[in-house]
A protein has these predicted regions:
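N-terminal targeting leaders
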Residues: 1-90
Length: 90
């Protein structure tokens, strides 16, 4: 990091609001995702976190794939993903 970046703090090079907006649109638009309202998508410094309850194990991977593809197609860069999606306890 440069001296000025260290002095003033590094600027976030990711648009977290735009990342969350694009990811949310993609999840809501996918008809194979059973309950997009049960999901929480956040981004902090380009680290996207997916959390909430999914109804099938396959849905966990699908959601991450849908979000990754959507961000790639929109030309939005991100740092990484944290997939904290869970199946309901029985």
């Amino acid at each position: 990091m440069s001296f000025l970046a260290n002095l003033f703090g590094a600027k976030n090079k990711y648009n977290d609001e735009q990342l969350v907006s694009q990811a949310t649109k993609a999840v809501v638009a996918d008809p194979l995702i059973s309950d997009p309202t049960a999901l929480v998508i956040t981004s902090k410094k380009g680290v996207i976190t997916l959390s909430g309850i999914v109804h099938k194990a396959q849905e966990k991977d699908r959601i991450e794939g849908v979000v990754r593809n959507s961000l790639k197609n929109a030309g939005l860069k991100h740092e990484s993903f944290i997939n904290e999606l869970k199946l309901p306890h029985k």
